[in-house]
Amino acid sequence: MTEAIAVVESRAIAPVQDWDVLQMLLEDHRSPNTRRAYDRDLRLFFAWWLDEDPHPEAIAYWLSLPQSEAIAVVLRWKASMRDRGLAEATINRRLAALKSLVRFSRRLGRCTFSLEDVKGDRVQSYRDTTGTTPERFRELLALPNRQTAKGARDYAILRLLWENALRRSEAVQTRVQDLEQGDRRLWILGKGKGRQRLPVSLSVEMVQALQDWLRWHPKAEPEQPLFTALDRRSYGQQLSDQAVYLLVKRSAEAIKLGKRLSPHRIRHSAITAALDATGGNIRLVQKLSRHSRLETLQRYDDARQDFQGECTEHLAKLLG
């Protein structure tokens, strides 16, 4: 009796160094900003530790370290960043990138140690939520010549940043089809929402400003970006985050605002103005800001009312 021998084709398992774990980690995150930050911070770590880029072999070597040695390396890196005077938030962000790489590798079975016992530096939670006033922002809005393509576009962007407290990434990632003119609604990619678009309501004036810009739009088709570049080299392409930043910065300089203004500070200004207009109705303004935590808005409200400054004035009066 003869037995048939089945030949089974086998695939060799790729050695550890052939796994591009860093690339897999980056692809596991939706946010382009997160991917860029992780890539940059991990490159800085490997440059400090091995004087090399984080290529697969270097990462495989890092992931093969025993627990005690890995933690010792990270603690030395943390100390070196402190010695260079880096801010606590910067140190914590770089540690978070490295911890994320290790956690991801553990899930893949490519790492046996953990960095969860390495603690970040304590960061003061205060944030400067000041920006500009509605009166000064009206001056800024008067700058663009709305009878030109660039002026119509810039006016619409500035007004949208203020009225809807948008982040600049939320503004530039919108498409023509995301604007529902009849319903006065714009669908945006909100922070932390992946690829899910969220609706924001628009004022009549905002819809009119967007309609004025669309008459100049290089190619106002549904899938096209709502805001496009108008320079010769990038004509018709999606407007970049940096272009919006420069628009705000130069506009503030043109009206001699006297302080630095950025798209995010316009967002701060809009949220603060909304708190003023609603008598500090935090829950209502949360619908505008789309903050997930009320505590964040509470900081805006505290800064708006300046309770500490009020107490200082009382104490000063006690001195006569």
Swiss-Prot record:
CC per GO annotation: cytoplasm
Pfam families xref list: Phage_int_SAM_1, Phage_integrase
GO molecular function: DNA binding
Subcellular location per the Swiss-Prot or TrEMBL entry: Cytoplasm
Residues of the Tyr recombinase domain: 127-313
The keyword Cell cycle belongs to this UniProt entry's keyword annotation: yes
Gene Ontology biological process terms, A to Z: cell division; chromosome segregation; DNA integration; DNA recombination
Sorted UniProt keywords: Cell cycle, Cell division, Chromosome partition, Cytoplasm, DNA integration, DNA recombination, DNA-binding, Plasmid
Family: Belongs to the 'phage' integrase family.
Gene3D superfamilies named in the record: 1.10.150.130, Intergrase catalytic core (1.10.443.10)
Active site location: R167, K193, H264, R267, H291, Y300
Function: Site-specific tyrosine recombinase, which acts by catalyzing the cutting and rejoining of the recombining DNA molecules.
Core-binding (CB) domain sequence ranges: 16-106
Species of origin: Synechococcus elongatus (strain ATCC 33912 / PCC 7942 / FACHB-805)
Lineage: Bacteria, Bacillati, Cyanobacteriota, Cyanophyceae, Synechococcales
Name under which the protein is recorded: Tyrosine recombinase Synpcc7942_B2651
Statement: the UniProt record of this protein carries the keyword Membrane: no
